[in-house]
C-alpha cells in the first residue's frame, strides 16, 4: 500500500491553513471596520441631508411663522411632520413623504460629485 492511498485528499499543509485563518481574521476585522464606517457615514449623511433640505429637527426654517401659516391655510402638514413622521396616514398628500432619509442608510461610496 502506498502512502498516497492513506493521504486525506482534503487536507492541506499547516502553512496554508494558517494563512487562511489570517485571511479570515483580516476579513472580519475589515467587515467590523466597514460597519463602523457605515454607521458614521450614515449619521454624517443625515446631517448633510438635513442641511440640504433645511428641515432638520433643530432647523430654524421648520418653526418659521410664515411657513406654518401657509401650511395651515393650505391644510398641509408641517415640514417637520412630513419628513419625520413615518406613520403618516395619508403619505401621498405630503410633499416630502419620500424624504425619510433620517431612518435609512446613506452610502457615500455611491455619491458622485461633479
Swiss-Prot record:
Q: What does this protein do?
A: May be involved in phosphatase regulation and/or generation of precursor metabolites and energy.
Q: Where is composition skewed (Basic and acidic residues) in this entry?
A: 1-20
Organism superkingdom:
Eukaryota
Q: What is the lineage of its organism?
A: Eukaryota, Fungi, Dikarya, Ascomycota, Saccharomycotina
Q: Residue ranges of region Disordered?
A: 1-22
- The protein's name: Uncharacterized protein YER121W
Amino acid at each position: 500500500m502506498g502512502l498516497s492511498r492513506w493521504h486525506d485528499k482534503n487536507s492541506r499543509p499547516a502553512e496554508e491553513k494558517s494563512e487562511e485563518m489570517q485571511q479570515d481574521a483580516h476579513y472580519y476585522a475589515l467587515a467590523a471596520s466597514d460597519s463602523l464606517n457605515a454607521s458614521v457615514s450614515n449619521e454624517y449623511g443625515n446631517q448633510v441631508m438635513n442641511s440640504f433640505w433645511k428641515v432638520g429637527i433643530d432647523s430654524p426654517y421648520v418653526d418659521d411663522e410664515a411657513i406654518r401659516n401657509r401650511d395651515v391655510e393650505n391644510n398641509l402638514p408641517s415640514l417637520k411632520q412630513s419628513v419625520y413622521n413615518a406613520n403618516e396616514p395619508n403619505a401621498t398628500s405630503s410633499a416630502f413623504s419620500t424624504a425619510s432619509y433620517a431612518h435609512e442608510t446613506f452610502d457615500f461610496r455611491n455619491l458622485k460629485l461633479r
